[in-house]
Design a protein with these regions (language model features):
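N-terminal secretory signal peptides that target proteins for export/translocation
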Residues: 1-3
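Bacterial N-terminal signal peptides
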Residues: 9-20
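Compact, glycine-rich, soluble single-domain proteins
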Residues: 24-170
Length: 170
């Protein structure tokens, strides 16, 4: 078969999957950072540090367990707008600038169909932290709370941390 025909032959099954409502799997990132609220109470963080990772975020994921979250860093600071498209569980969104929480969107509502509401303050932020709904209040996090995101060393040969409900990598 000619190369052009091969390309069309490979594209058709992919198009069929999209038209049939194929949904890509959720992303599971390793724990590479933490935010310690006290010396003995740290939130383990997946870091969505690329545009692709940020666009997927926590879509299609089950509820986050306590003391787990996803960090979305922005350098340079940006006007960040988040939505809950294809995110089945409510979240708390903490918007961070200059090492402190500048805004909180608590108990954001899942949105399984477009259009979806967007969340975010009318100011640039250095990053956004997503936690399970209710965790900000439960942990005593409020606007003005200091934020210190620190890297976590991953041990070579050890699989990345993931919740028990997460599927094992192929």
């Amino acid at each position: 078969m000619a190369p052009r025909a091969w390309g069309a032959g490979l594209a058709l099954p992919g198009m069929a999957l999209l038209l049939c409502g194929f949904t890509p799997p959720p992303q599971w990132l390793p724990i590479t950072a933490q935010w310690c609220l006290t010396p003995n109470r740290c939130i383990a963080l997946e870091v969505a540090d690329t545009p692709e990772r940020q666009s997927k975020g926590l879509q299609l994921r089950p509820a986050l367990p306590p003391l787990r979250g996803m960090w979305f860093p922005y350098s340079p600071p940006s006007l960040a707008r988040f939505w809950m498209h294809r995110t089945p569980e409510p979240l708390d969104m903490l918007f961070v600038r200059g090492g402190q929480v500048v805004a909180i969107e608590a108990h954001t509502t899942p949105c399984l169909r477009l259009p979806c509401r967007s969340y975010g303050p009318d100011q640039e932020v250095d990053g956004v932290l997503e936690l399970a709904a209710g965790q900000a209040e439960a942990l005593g996090i409020a606007v003005g709370s200091p934020v210190g995101i620190e890297p976590v060393t991953i041990t070579p040969g050890r699989p990345p941390a993931r919740p028990p409900s997460a599927p094992a990598p192929d």
